């Protein structure tokens, strides 16, 4: 019955644990699990173990390399896929520094007296992001963009004591799905606002109509949109409208583009959220990424912020010191009444972002943003030269992401490009007002003109040009 892969599977140990929790058998413990998918203890011995013999280190490494060789890598060209995370060049120094033993942990530095280096690095992250976004208070990280939106909605409800949040109908569906899950638990209704079909801008008339109902806790928008790339020119007017209605303005931003766009602090945002992935984190399945969360200087907002805050102070001997501050908001003190349930977090990713921002500086970050703008516009221009292709589909200004209409099903085109070794686009069929022929394409500073020309030529052949 004992199995080398299953801890505590020896009968004597199992019996002792079952007795301690007041359960008569393993079957009784798992009675809520459908029997068709349950592996009984009698079947444990049938689980295969490797090669039936111990393997040497060299053999194990060979097996792992064989498995890894089945993966497909997209480095030349990088993927033309964004939608909330983007292909970016990650300087080697970022990984070199965050893999140092002093930093390599995701755990919260509760013991300030032995964590000064880690805390200072997190304080620097907060300071750098505050400067980039022109927001006064930044926390030490949330999980990702989606969780940051969800936490912002919950925070808006606590501050305003209202339970409705408005979002544009073209809000990133992945962000919306997670945020709606957060909102449901907090008793918040999420309502979509119409977006202009030609420009991709939020419809101010529809927004005003919904705000007139008087129960809006917040309006959430993205600048630029992470699922259309559009830089909404109505963003300031929308923020003023929600403030006039007594709600908060939550703005989701892509951090690199803030080097050339007006930051949320100057757009009237009460809360700014986003993902730190473009700041030196690269792409890796679902993460780990970095939820950015910032607020303007307002006691009501700061006291209701989720997540850790690192502050600078002086110790008993007058020396500069760093510590976690305003901890009475947090679950290790307030338990169920805490402003969030995040403890162990993305601190290591925050340090990576701090390294990236420090390395590039304001001018370097601006150059990355300008290169992304240039390359995405070059790609849209080249694609528009193909017969039957409309690029960009929306008239609003864009950066990195842009929508394209093809003369064929976008999903089919994507599969055929993949067969040619290029991962390109997110089909938009079924999303908002887009058709099956519409696709979201992404081009950043990681792409070159050669990469774009390759994409255009391959797409031309896929379209039968």
From Swiss-Prot:
Gene3D superfamilies named in the record: Aspartate Aminotransferase, domain 1, Type I PLP-dependent aspartate aminotransferase-like (Major domain)
Stored CDD domains: GDC-P (cd00613)
EC number(s) on file: 1.4.4.2
Subunit record text: The glycine cleavage system is composed of four proteins: P, T, L and H. In this organism, the P 'protein' is a heterodimer of two subunits.
UniProt entry keywords in alphabetical sequence: Oxidoreductase
Entry's family note: Belongs to the GcvP family. N-terminal subunit subfamily.
GO molecular function, one term: glycine dehydrogenase (decarboxylating) activity
PANTHER family: GLYCINE CLEAVAGE SYSTEM P-PROTEIN, GLYCINE DEHYDROGENASE (DECARBOXYLATING)
This protein's name: Probable glycine dehydrogenase (decarboxylating) subunit 1
NCBIfam families tied to this protein: PRK00451.1 (NF001696)
Reactions accelerated catalytically: N(6)-[(R)-lipoyl]-L-lysyl-[glycine-cleavage complex H protein] + glycine + H(+) = N(6)-[(R)-S(8)-aminomethyldihydrolipoyl]-L-lysyl-[glycine-cleavage complex H protein] + CO2
Residues spanning the membrane: none
First and last residue of the signal peptide: none
Pfam families: GDC-P
InterPro entries from the UniProt entry: GcvPA (IPR023010), GDC-P_N (IPR049315), GDC_P (IPR020581), PyrdxlP-dep_Trfase (IPR015424), PyrdxlP-dep_Trfase_major (IPR015421), PyrdxlP-dep_Trfase_small (IPR015422)
Organism listed in the record: Aeropyrum pernix (strain ATCC 700893 / DSM 11879 / JCM 9820 / NBRC 100138 / K1)
């Amino acid at each position: 019955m004992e199995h080398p892969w299953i801890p505590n599977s020896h009968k004597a140990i199992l019996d002792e644990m079952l007795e301690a929790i007041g359960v008569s058998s393993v079957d009784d413990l798992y009675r809520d699990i459908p029997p068709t998918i349950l592996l009984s203890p009698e079947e444990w011995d049938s689980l295969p173990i490797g090669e039936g013999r111990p393997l040497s280190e060299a053999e194990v490494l060979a097996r792992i390399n064989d498995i890894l060789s089945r993966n497909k890598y997209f480095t030349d060209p990088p993927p033309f896929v964004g939608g909330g995370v983007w292909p970016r060049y990650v300087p080697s120094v970022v990984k070199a520094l965050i893999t140092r033993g002093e930093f390599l942990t995701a755990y919260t530095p509760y013991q300030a007296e032995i964590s000064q280096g880690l805390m200072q690095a997190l304080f620097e992250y907060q300071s750098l992001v505050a400067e980039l976004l022109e927001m006064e208070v930044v926390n030490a990280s949330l999980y990702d963009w989606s969780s940051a939106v969800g936490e912002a909605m919950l925070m808006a409800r606590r501050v305003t004591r209202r339970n409705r949040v408005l979002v544009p109908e073209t809000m990133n569906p992945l962000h919306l799905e997670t945020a709606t899950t957060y909102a449901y638990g907090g008793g918040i209704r999420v309502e979509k606002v119409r977006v202009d079909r030609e420009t991709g801008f939020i419809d101010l008339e529809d927004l005003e109509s919904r705000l007139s109902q008087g129960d809006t806790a917040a309006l959430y928008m993205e600048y630029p949109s992470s699922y259309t790339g559009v830089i909404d020119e109505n963003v300031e007017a929308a923020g003023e409208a929600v403030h006039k209605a007594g709600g908060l303005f939550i703005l989701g931003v892509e951090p690199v583009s803030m080097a050339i766009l007006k930051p949320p602090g100057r757009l009237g945002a009460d809360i700014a959220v986003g993902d730190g992935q473009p700041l030196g984190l690269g792409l890796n399945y679902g993460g780990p990424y970095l939820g950015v969360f910032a607020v303007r200087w307002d006691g009501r907002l700061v006291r209701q912020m989720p997540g850790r805050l690192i502050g600078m102070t002086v110790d008993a001997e007058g020396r500069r010191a760093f510590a976690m501050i305003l901890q009475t908001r947090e679950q290790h003190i307030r338990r169920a009444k805490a402003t969030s349930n995040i403890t162990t977090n993305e601190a290591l990713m925050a340090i990576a972002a701090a390294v990236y921002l420090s390395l590039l500086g304001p001018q370097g970050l601006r150059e990355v943003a300008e290169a992304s703008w240039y390359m995405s516009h070059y790609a849209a221009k080249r694609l528009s030269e193909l017969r039957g292709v409309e690029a960009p589909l929306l008239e609003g200004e864009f950066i990195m992401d842009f929508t394209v209409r093809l003369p064929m099903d976008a999903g089919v085109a994507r599969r055929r490009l993949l067969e040619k070794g290029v991962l390109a686009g997110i089909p938009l069929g079924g999303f908002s007002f887009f058709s099956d022929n519409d696709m979201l394409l992404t081009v950043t500073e990681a792409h070159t003109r050669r990469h774009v020309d390759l994409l255009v030529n391959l797409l031309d052949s896929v379209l039968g040009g």
